[in-house]
């Protein structure tokens, strides 16, 4: 209706429950397909970033909410999904600091995750 497509954000697993990732991915994808909505695969990007760099801290102390790095990764995945463009090279203007090297890594993870999820060519 009116050329609008709903978006559903796939959330991330809690830090101490990484096994939730696939359950969240499957459930969100199913709902997205049923609702003809675009699913934004943030949870898969979190899992991939942690897989590639287990020391990266994407969570706040509560092990649920995102750290500045987690929030930045989320923003990169949303950008890539909505605009079909790579976030690699975008400037970071957040209030809380994310190191440039880390920001670049998160941009790469976001783009690769989105391309894989939607089966896009890079």
Regions found by a protein language model. Give the residues of each.
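Long, charge-rich low-complexity segments
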Residues: 111-122
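Catalytic His-Asp segment of secreted/periplasmic serine-dependent ester chemistry enzymes
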Residues: 17-111
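Surface-exposed cleft-lining segments at the edges of enzyme active sites
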Residues: 10-17
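A short helix->loop->beta-strand "cap" motif at the edges of active sites that frequently abuts
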Residues: 1-7, 37
């Amino acid at each position: 209706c009116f050329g609008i497509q709903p978006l559903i954000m796939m959330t991330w697993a809690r830090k101490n429950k990484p096994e939730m990732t696939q359950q969240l991915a499957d459930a969100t994808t199913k709902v997205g397909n049923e609702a003809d909505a675009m699913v934004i695969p943030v949870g898969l990007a979190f899992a991939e970033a942690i897989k590639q760099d287990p020391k990266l801290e994407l969570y706040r102390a509560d092990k649920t909410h995102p750290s500045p790095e987690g929030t930045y990764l989320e923003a990169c995945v949303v950008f890539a999904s909505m605009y079909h463009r790579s976030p690699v090279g975008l400037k970071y203007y957040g209030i809380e600091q994310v190191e440039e090297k880390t920001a670049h890594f998160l941009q790469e993870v976001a783009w690769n995750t989105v391309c894989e999820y939607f089966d896009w060519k890079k």
